[in-house]
């Protein structure tokens, strides 16, 4: 299981739970809340992982602002999550433009199968994410509006940015069983296997 997030304390924080499959991802769950710190999120995420039937998490992808220290703990969110999940599990999404992340989201969403029940509020946010239109100039803004929809959308596109490279591609030619092969194909397979013997 892989998790991507957008962090916020006074703002909302959003968390997407991903499962790699051949050709894309099952998006299992979206969770969000506001006013919570890392110490509140860690047990909640661990509980969500258990509820989803996973034994552990492969990676948690966090935005670059996870490196900022807080006044309350004097530690970064990244450090707190590393303590809760392990050093090797926490990664920071590389800095790119929001436009690049949106493009990654547009590309990867075609390869995602969503649990409509557990992702309902996150999907609402993805549908509602929009650019502001300037009537006077007849153009859209360069960046989407920052509102309630930006939290699930940012969390989703952070995940898309790093996960688009890891999509498991289906085999070009599906394997044939012995009863589907011609006699010549069986002889060729046999020759190849014999040549690899010691």
Task: Tell where the protein language model's regions lie, with residue ranges.
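Short glycine-rich loop/turn motifs
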Residues: 11-15
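Mg2+-dependent endonuclease catalytic cores in nucleic-acid-processing enzymes, primarily RNase H-like
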Residues: 16, 22-147, 166-170, 176-177, ...
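Short, low-complexity Ser/Thr-rich regulatory SLiMs
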Residues: 7, 19-20
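Two-metal-ion RNase H-like nuclease active-site motif
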Residues: 1-9, 62-63
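Internal mixed-charge
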Residues: 155
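Histidine-centered active-site/metal-ligand motif
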Residues: 151
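Short, hydrophobic alpha-helical segments
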Residues: 159-167
């Amino acid at each position: 299981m892989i998790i991507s997030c957008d962090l916020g304390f006074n703002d909302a924080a959003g968390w997407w739970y991903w499962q790699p499959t051949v050709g894309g991802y099952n998006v299992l769950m979206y969770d969000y809340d506001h006013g919570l710190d890392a110490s509140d999120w860690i047990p909640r995420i661990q509980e969500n992982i258990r509820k989803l039937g996973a034994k552990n998490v492969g990676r948690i992808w966090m935005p670059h602002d996870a490196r900022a220290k807080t006044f309350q703990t004097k530690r970064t969110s990244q450090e707190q999550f590393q303590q809760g999940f392990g050093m090797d599990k926490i990664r920071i999404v590389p800095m790119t433009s929001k436009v690049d992340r949106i493009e990654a989201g547009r590309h990867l969403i075609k390869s995602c199968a969503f649990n409509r029940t557990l992702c309902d509020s996150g999907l609402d946010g993805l549908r509602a994410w929009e650019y502001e239109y300037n009537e006077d100039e007849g153009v859209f803004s360069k960046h989407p509006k920052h509102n309630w929809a930006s939290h699930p959308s940012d969390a989703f596109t952070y995940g898309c940015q790093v996960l688009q490279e890891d999509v498991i591609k289906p085999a070009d030619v599906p394997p044939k069983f012995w009863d589907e092969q011609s006699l010549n194909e069986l002889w060729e397979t046999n020759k190849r296997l014999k040549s690899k013997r010691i």
